[in-house]
A protein has these predicted regions:
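Conserved RecA-like ASCE P-loop NTPase motor core of nucleic-acid helicases/translocases
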Residues: 170-177
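Conserved helix-turn-beta segment of the N-terminal RecA-like "Helicase ATP-binding" lobe
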Residues: 179-215
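ATP-dependent helicase/translocase motor core
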Residues: 2-148, 157-166, 186, 190, ...
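ATP-binding Walker
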Residues: 153-154
Length: 218
């Protein structure tokens, strides 16, 4: 069974200082059933039509997913991965979401799941303890709070959990190195493991956050 990975859908602006929002992650589709014509190919996977076209003006109107490629696609080119993806022409998640829309989408979408074993993953006890302490402090903050977590307990996922569960308007993260800045930027873009099918701590209906990365003075 052959597969092909469709590119993510995102909004991005800026060059050095970047603002980014992931609208939909990569999609892996089976390419066993492919309809071809002179301008485009339609992959049918689980009843959903994915159209890949080399011409932005010619594509399958019935397909909810339409992706522009650098050349006319064929099944063999998809199998060989001999095709370059350019941009989404049509996607169900192509929406304009304001920061308020994002925050509102997080309401009642966070689950306080405790990790029991490898088959039932969730947040570790130190993470849940820190998260509850943070949320309690945020209800009536009179002064700054400091949360200390042991090495290896998952500080990043705790920050991401606080962002969504607390429906924070803004979170500022400072880091000591360029490498860590890029690493955390990528984590915040995707919400780490929180939205993955394995964890499902954050529901799939919740929108991804709008994330900025500052690398130079304004």
């Amino acid at each position: 069974m052959g597969t092909f990975v469709l590119m993510e859908l995102c909004k991005q602006s800026g060059v050095k200082n970047v603002i980014y929002q992931l609208l939909a992650p990569n999609i892996t589709i089976n390419i066993d059933e492919v309809e071809e014509n002179r301008s485009y190919a339609v992959v049918i996977d689980k009843g959903i039509r994915y159209c890949l076209t080399g011409n932005p003006g010619i594509y399958d109107e019935e397909a909810p997913y339409v992706l522009l490629t650098d050349r006319t696609p064929t099944k063999q080119k998809l199998i060989d991965n001999d095709i370059r993806q350019r941009k989404w022409i049509k996607h169900p998640n192509q929406i304009e979401a304001s920061p308020d829309d994002v925050i509102n989408s997080w309401e009642n979408r966070f689950h306080f799941k405790l990790e029991e074993n490898e088959e039932n993953p969730g947040l570790r006890r130190p993470q849940l303890g820190a998260l509850h302490a943070l949320l309690s402090h945020m209800l009536a903050p009179k002064e700054a709070a400091t949360v200390v977590l042991p090495t290896g307990t998952g500080k990043t996922e705790t920050m991401l959990s606080a962002l969504v569960a607390g429906r924070c308007n803004r979170v500022l993260v400072t880091v000591p190195t360029n490498a860590l800045r890029g690493q955390l930027f990528n984590k915040f873009k995707t919400l780490g493991v929180l939205k993955t099918p394995k964890f499902e701590i954050v529901d799939k209906e919740a929108l991804y956050p709008i994330v900025g990365m500052i690398t130079s003075a304004f």
